[in-house]
Amino acid sequence: MADIRVKICGMKTRADMEAAAAAGAAYVGLNFYAKSARSVTIAQAAALASDAPVGLAKVGLVVNPTDADLDAITGSVPLDMIQLHGQESVERVAEIKTRYGLPVMKVIGVAEAADLDPIDLYAQVADQLMVDAKAPKGAKLPGGNGISFDWQLLASKKYWQAPWMLAGGLTPENVAEAIRKTGARQVDVASGVESAPAQKDPDLMRAFVEAAQAV
């Protein structure tokens, strides 16, 4: 289905951005979480976002950001959306949305059915949701760990108040199955299109988008 929208997260170079656009991605992610190998500085992100191919929505990934963090990022980087990938409360999501005037995507980590319970509340304030695999205990990163969760958990949970995106261990080989099982209309990928840690592969990007849109 050509209306499946793909987000490729972890852009680090102009070549990454161009390859994502050429592959047909709708969104690209700029990672501001310093502990991640995919992270970029504000200066790097500003250069990438300012020169981004036309049509790519630029999403800034942050984890439990302070206002000072977001002031610095949004003051320099022309983002189209903020992705909150930490333990931000419903109230904090609403605050950020109001303060910065940008659409906000809230990530919900899922390992079991009970993890889906907060989604209805977040859907009332967030512009979009991302349903991702919950990071393993002790993991250094909140996402981008290349692990998935039981997609059947979403079989009867497809309709929330806000649009949502599926993430977690998706690859060109399994994204079609994930879409069929969950009904997702949007999917996110990072490690699944890398040939080495934090190294995006244009061929894998293209294969991923083609597989997603062929469902």
From Swiss-Prot:
UniProt key word Lyase: no
Cross-referenced InterPro entries: Aldolase_TIM, PRAI_dom, RibuloseP-bd_barrel, TrpF_fam
Record bears the keyword Isomerase: yes
E.C. code: 5.3.1.24
Metabolic or biological pathway: Amino-acid biosynthesis; L-tryptophan biosynthesis; L-tryptophan from chorismate: step 3/5
The organism's place on the tree of life at top rank: Bacteria
Protein name: N-(5'-phosphoribosyl)anthranilate isomerase
Pfam families the record matches: PRAI
Species assigned in the record: Ruegeria sp. (strain TM1040) (Silicibacter sp.)
Enzyme class of the recorded protein, top EC level: isomerase
Catalytic activity from the UniProt record: N-(5-phospho-beta-D-ribosyl)anthranilate = 1-(2-carboxyphenylamino)-1-deoxy-D-ribulose 5-phosphate
Family: Belongs to the TrpF family.
A GO MF label: phosphoribosylanthranilate isomerase activity
UniProt keyword list: Amino-acid biosynthesis, Aromatic amino acid biosynthesis, Isomerase, Tryptophan biosynthesis
Record gene name: trpF
CDD domains: PRAI
Any GO BP annotation: L-tryptophan biosynthetic process
